[in-house]
Amino acid sequence: MIEFLSDIDTQLLLFFNGIHSPFWDYFMSAFTGKVIWVPMYASILYILLKNFHWKVALCYVVAIALTITFADQMCNSFLRPLVGRLRPSNPENPIADLVYIVNGRRGGGFGFPSCHAANSFGLAIFLICLFRKRWLSIFIVLWAFTNSYTRLYLGLHYPGDLVAGAIIGGFGGWLFYFIAHKLTARLQSDTPVPGKGAGMKQTEVMIYTGLLTLAGIIIYSIVQS
């Protein structure tokens, strides 16, 4: 059964990794970056400060940081050495010659689970639980999905790596939101209550910031290709 699932994982990887073009090479390489999304991350802090007392906002910022730390360490420091599954792009992997590599980027040694997927879905689930806004939820899930898919396109992860990472990150996002929500309920009772989206203000700022970043990536990719 494990061998069967591994074969399916490999075939899915080679199928999606094989769909490429100069435009998408630049797009995926840019989208998967961390620094380029700093403005969107800053907008999250802005929304928190607009809706909560600074002590409550700080508590949520710490909780988000713990979510990312949990996801990253669980994947990178604990599970990767334990499982020992080579990235498809790793030269020592038997299928490495079949994988399309973008700009010579091969990543590290092991790839299961994906830290990118874990971090992306950890943040997404945390914000969905916190803000409870439909359009923001749709946007952040699409962002997390695309961010994860870039790793497949770039040949850095198998689909199974991404699914496992998303599950781990999603659990971490829910867990640290739950803890932070319980703590902040004691800090301040007269702030908007997370879970009642109607009381949350200016959450669309994050969507606009993210879409502007996406537009910049698209323009960059068109020009470069």
Swiss-Prot record:
Query: Which biological pathway?
Result: Bacterial outer membrane biogenesis; LPS lipid A biosynthesis
Indicate the principal place this protein occupies in or around the cell: membrane
Task: List the cysteine pairs that form cystine.
Answer: none
Q: When this gene is knocked out, what is seen?
A: No visible phenotype in the absence of host gut inflammation. Loss of resistance to the cationic antimicrobial peptide polymyxin B (PMB). Lipid A is bi- rather than mono-phosphorylated, with mass corresponding to a 1- 4'-phosphorylated molecule. Increased negative charge on the cell surface leading to greater binding of PMB, increased outer membrane disruption by PMB. Decreased survival (fitness) in host (mouse) cells after infection with C.rodentium (a mouse enteropathogen that induces inflammation) or in mice subjected to other inflammation-producing stimuli.
Q: Which GO terms describe its biological process?
A: lipid A biosynthetic process; lipopolysaccharide biosynthetic process; response to antibiotic
| Subcellular location per the Swiss-Prot or TrEMBL entry | Cell inner membrane
Which keywords fit this entry according to its UniProt record? Answer: Antibiotic resistance, Cell inner membrane, Cell membrane, Hydrolase, Lipid A biosynthesis, Lipid biosynthesis, Lipid metabolism, Lipopolysaccharide biosynthesis, Membrane, Transmembrane, Transmembrane helix
Q: Where are the transmembrane segments?
A: 29-49, 51-71, 110-130, 136-156, 160-180, 203-223
| EC class of the enzyme, as a word | hydrolase
Q: What is its EC number?
A: 3.1.-.-
Fetch the InterPro entries from UniProt.
Answer: P_Acid_Pase_2/haloperoxi_sf, P_Acid_Pase_2/haloperoxidase
Question: Which SMART domains does the record associate with it?
Answer: acidPPc
The molecular function GO annotations come to: hydrolase activity
| Role | Probably removes the 4'-phosphate group from lipid A. Removal of this phosphate group confers resistance to cationic antimicrobial peptides (CAMPs), inflammation-associated peptides produced by the human host. This LPS modification helps maintain the stability of this commensal bacterium in gut microbiota.
Similarity remark? Belongs to the lipid A LpxF 4'-phosphatase family.
Q: What is this protein called?
A: Lipid A 4'-phosphatase
Q: Which organism is it from?
A: Bacteroides thetaiotaomicron (strain ATCC 29148 / DSM 2079 / JCM 5827 / CCUG 10774 / NCTC 10582 / VPI-5482 / E50)
The gene behind this protein is: lpxF
